[in-house]
């Protein structure tokens, strides 16, 4: 039977991608249905209890700048906040927060349940309704049919999921949850390229059985960083430390002795695991010369007895897990509450997606999250928001929402996936972005909030706060440019104590802040110069814009040069082997990827600037230089 109400957008899955997708579509006015196999697990952290990190924190800030939920939820559920790379430049500084799993999940659920235009329904989805290569709805496990104009699949590791502990395995989407077999079979019958990936998680330990006195405490930052542009420190619950310990040679010997029963090393698992979050058995094999590996002992919540030993993800048999855990300093009497495991699951080649995350073969069908080969809550949430927004825009018959690589890490993420695909779980790093000086955490709102407002993602309260901040920053910049200090100024004696070279001529306050030894906060302490602006976030923005103005201008020039050829078209039937000077490797990669434009060709791994120059020379020589008006969706 058909459900009585038809929807604009249906989102399948209530994880990090699904919640952001459903919330985005609903904020934009689309009548949205979120279908999940269990409402109680909406927003659940399946693996590590943390949000953010290098590259990942940037994605969370961007999700937040577009009105998403993740940053606000972690501000309400974060029990330890740190700024990583704090001693480095602003481009690579990143916020990371340890989460109380329950508080975080409750915060997400509260946001979801209070979102207008969003309906929840608990049922697994077994089938898609497809007519004339267009999705028209879904069919649930009990045969109930829901009609929709767009469908977003955010099914995580549930598609054909198989859980491995040693040589034992069973079907599962994650520990305690059933897999999605019927939907996996349905998708495999469609013309998508499909493969298998693997991820894993460590055993959870009972904190009462650990000796924290022999471990190194790792406190959070003080004052605590705030994740959301709408957040504040008053939201944060009680803050507690994490701890650090290490594996040792005995640990490694135990692991080596169990490799003959490892599903990874005996070929039982065929899927490729995450390169940047390897299992402990992978680490001791790949880095055989290392005598120890660091373990971050992370509490799972303020009222939880469980801790997450970050760094010893494993799918070894339980007896080996027990022995390796108890060989670690502080874990000698550890009780394992939940065994570690690996999970193998289906993912679909993201090169079969448009930049909107709509599939190329089925109109109105969008994929987001681990189904596209990514790993991590943050990568999933970013894709979910973009997919949900584009699903709503398609229903509303409006232009798609596509972010360029120079506009957002979201743009880098989706362009990497859609252009190059992935053979292993894809994780975001700042190093993946060519223009990371422009794509900082601190300016995510100035890059994206106005764009979000234009398409309906950003509400009135966020828009008002954003405009207040931007006005404060601009007003202060104008003041600093217009206020001058000369050698006889009343502030000069105090100022000279802060400077390497004393004031010998007239300087604007802006020029003084540009000096390496001077900061905005220091300068504002001088009575006749300060007090400046109270908001530390706006003050940081003022200082960064002044100190990095030259570097930012140069990067903007680079972008302008690149964009001159970004949309230069490559003929669909182009024979790359005829281009003199291209290596066989480059020819093979271009032939396989068939990039539509010079811009897309330049982002294929292994395609050098020299190869791009040869392509442009060839196009010009043969009168083939043409540009497309708009990047294809």
Curated annotation (Swiss-Prot):
Its cofactor is FAD. It holds the Pfam family GIDA. GO terms for biological process: tRNA methylation; tRNA wobble uridine modification. The keyword Cytoplasm applies. FAD binds at residues 13-18, 125, 180, 370. It is found in: Cytoplasm. NAD(+) binds at residues 273-287. InterPro entries: FAD/NAD-bd_sf, GIDA_C_N, MnmG, MnmG-rel, MnmG-rel_CS, MnmG_C, MnmG_C_subdom, MnmG_C_subdom_sf. SUPFAM superfamilies: FAD/NAD(P)-binding domain (SSF51905). Keywords: Cytoplasm, FAD, Flavoprotein, NAD, tRNA processing. GO terms for cellular component: cytosol. GO terms for molecular function: flavin adenine dinucleotide binding. NAD-binding protein involved in the addition of a carboxymethylaminomethyl (cmnm) group at the wobble position (U34) of certain tRNAs, forming tRNA-cmnm(5)s(2)U34. PANTHER family: GLUCOSE INHIBITED DIVISION PROTEIN A, PROTEIN MTO1 HOMOLOG, MITOCHONDRIAL. Belongs to the MnmG family. Homodimer. Heterotetramer of two MnmE and two MnmG subunits. This is tRNA uridine 5-carboxymethylaminomethyl modification enzyme MnmG. It comes from Alteromonas mediterranea (strain DSM 17117 / CIP 110805 / LMG 28347 / Deep ecotype).
